[in-house]
Amino acid sequence: MITAEERRALLDRAITTYGAPAQMDMAVEETAELTKALCKIKRAQAGCEVTAAIGNVIEEMADVQIMLDQLRIIFHRSTEEVEEAKLERLKNRLDGRNNWQGSNLHKWIEKQFSTGGDGHE
C-alpha cells in the first residue's frame, strides 16, 4: 500500500511531468467518464451487466479522486472548509430549516396569489 507521502510525491510528479493544464484537462475527461459510467449503470439489466457497471463506476470514481487530489495541489487549496459549509447547508435543508415551503420567498409568493395581489404594494 502506498503511503500518504508516496502518494503526494507521485501526484506532484504527474503534475510536473504532464503540466497543470494537461492535468486539468484530464480531470475534465475523468469526470466525463464517471458521468458516462453513472448513466450506463441506470440502464444495466442483467446481474452480470449490473456487476460490471458497478465495477466501472468504482474505477471511474478512483480516477476522479486522483484528479481531485491533483487539482488541490495545483490550486494550493483544500476543499475541507467548503465541504463543511455545503454539508451544513445540506443538513439544514434535510432538517427543514432551509426548504422552499418555509422560505420567505415562498411565503411572499403565496400571499400575493392568495390575496389576488399583483406583487406590488
Which role fits each region the language model picked out?
Residues M1-E121:
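Flexible "arm" and connector segments at domain edges
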